[in-house]
Regions:
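Short, conserved phosphate-binding/catalytic loop or strand-edge motifs used
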Residues: 141-147
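N-terminal pre-domain/capping segments
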Residues: 1-137, 157, 161-172
Length: 174
């Protein structure tokens, strides 16, 4: 393990990768306001490049605001891809934020409302498209809002069936 002045020095072959949501976290919580300044995705990539990180991961909306126009989305992704190239970083993984929007209060892929399930699929496909453009080989499906109240709002077998259908659909899309 390479050491510099007694400290670990990360090398690209160690493949340290960080999420935009972790490095860019402003330090707010339910009990207080943000305590750190906002960092743009480009600033985060530059910082990660400076410390020797190998990669950067992201949720769709960590990079592209949910209300971005298609042209804005394309510009943002293009500029981010260039920032990664300029700083020697790869994007190994993307995921989709299926938890922040109030639409997902009842789940995303397992929601009772078919319009919410369709919205979740559209967001996931958009995240997959971003991932392809950035060279990511992995899409993470994190079900943070799936099933937390399954017993109270739907049968577990129905939730599992809906999740299976969503994953199968996304596999076909890929």
């Amino acid at each position: 393990i390479p050491m510099t002045n007694g400290h670990f020095k990360p090398l690209p072959e160690h493949k340290f990768s960080f999420g935009l949501w972790t490095v860019g976290n402003r330090g707010s919580d339910p009990f207080g306001a943000p305590v750190r300044p906002h960092l743009s995705p480009g600033q985060i990539v530059q910082l990660l490049g400076e410390v020797g990180a190998w990669g950067v991961n992201l949720h769709d909306n960590d990079l592209v605001p949910i209300d971005a126009t298609p042209a804005d989305r394309d510009n943002i992704v293009r500029e981010f891809r260039q920032a990664c190239l300029d700083n020697g970083l790869v994007v190994p993984m993307v995921t989709t934020n299926l938890f922040s929007d109030p639409a997902f209060k009842d789940g995303a892929f397992t929601a009772n409302d078919p319009a919410v399930r369709a919205f979740a699929l559209q967001k996931a496909m958009g995240a997959m498209d971003i991932g392809v453009e950035l060279g990511a080989a992995i899409l993470v499906i994190w079900g943070g809002r799936e099933g937390t109240e399954t017993d109270g709002c739907r049968r577990a077998d129905v939730a599992i069936q809906r999740l299976r259908e969503a994953v199968n659909f996304l596999c076909e899309y890929s």
